[in-house]
Amino acid sequence: MSNEVVLKEENKLEINFNPYELALVKGDLSKLSDVERASYVKNLCESLSLNMLTKPFEYIVLNGKLTLYANKSATDQLRQIRKVSITKTEVAQVGDIYMVTAYAATPDGRTDCDTGALNIKNLGGDNLANAIMKAITKAKRRVTLSICGLGMLDESELETIKEKRFL
């Protein structure tokens, strides 16, 4: 792979990545053809031992970049394949924010934790119960991705992002 390096005005260096490098380095899949995108997703699934037929990743346009996010299928499979255990959860409420911290461990002794938080202002009854369950789910999915070394969005985080478009 070769990058085109161009010296721009005011001695600013610009690197023009080819489409596959953009996907790998910048996380932008928009310049890939349909076939290249399918290949990228297939390779990602294979590298993580995920079943591609279960659609563990979905596309989203975020900040002008076409990217992938991990859905429930991805995090459920990752927990099973990597034998990730959610060892405990802790709950806290700060003002109108309901926070759940999930702790995870792997058989080799690695541990991690991550938090899911939701605004519960003006919620009651079933809406409050659903928000609490969402915060738990968000924390568990986030810690799963984290302990597996994947710095990517999961679907439980998407509703709080305003500038997004699903494909």
Where are the model-predicted features located?
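Polyanion-binding surfaces on beta-sheet-dominated domains and ring/shell assemblies
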Residues: 2-167
